Amino acid sequence: MFWYKIIPLDVLLFRDAKPFSPGERAWAGSVFPPNGHAIAGALRQLIGDKITCQIKGPFFCYNQETLYFPRPLGFVNSNPLIPLVWQQKNSLNYAFWDRQQPCPLLSVKNSDNSAQESFQFRQFLPYNVIIKYLETGKISAEDWAIQEEGEDQPWAVETRSHNALLESTRQVKDADGYFVENAIRLKSNWSLAIGIDREIETPTTIRLGGEGHRAILQRCDNLSAQWETLAKLSNQNFQIGGKSLAYLITPGVFERLHDNYQSICQSWPWEWKLAHITNSNQKSGQLVSVASDRAVPISCRMQYENRSIPAPQVFAAPSGSIYYLNQPQKLFQESDEATKQAKRWRQLGYSELLWISFEVETGFL
């Protein structure tokens, strides 16, 4: 796997996944960081029209040498959230809860969280903190404190006005010819980072996002070493087995065809069945609970009559989601039985998981 930095030359435009027409909505929203489809589109000019390589990311990179990942959502401030059923001595185990849904999560006070309200919390965590998280299952209170500018949000939003032009002309439309759009500017010393299983001669430029804005693609071997260390530790935790946490570091697309061939998305993999059952005819699985947030809409494109047209929206679980399992379980997207379409999501970098072993000795309980 070869790792690269993406350094924007100016602002970037990533229009949100909602249908947009200046006549209906004079304000075009923006979504950032870009999804795997946007990255694949930028790479097409370098590696060919048909993307067959494996993509990791995108993530953030600080000062050209450190990977940053979205904060795990299994915390309230610095206090970890633990499934109720994993806290056998808690009196709330006598309470009723809907067993057709994931188990409720309870906040467990961190032993070193004194004065935690006196600082701002990181929304993106550096490589060294994630390594400790994978090794111990804990993130100390001081590791949540912002130490570098941009760790709360590595980008700024700039509002730009646009004039819509008449087709095949350079004249502004008389009606609905003006709208406003949000542009993204990365803060100083920040860049995007991606991994690709293909070597590309760098430095080179790519078109990224809307309106042909350009960015520099630069090889960075430091990031390769960091990713290999994380992947090795994650695989070791997966092999250990037992109670585990799956940490989602890129948007997770978990969709399944239902009646009338309608695809439905949810915030955890469909193949991960709940560990608790409501009747004896059900087969229990390994999934105990989920810590997640609002779904992320993803707008793709598809071929229709030799034309590229907008595809139906897909809703992904947000980066940082945490899944609590009694035993680690692989994704269907990574299995040999997976369809070509299912494997495509992983190929584009979606649904990337890091595994953490959960032990009582870590101090959670």
Question: What does each model-found stretch correspond to?
Answer:
Residues 2-365:
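Conserved active-site/ligand-binding neighborhood in enzyme cores
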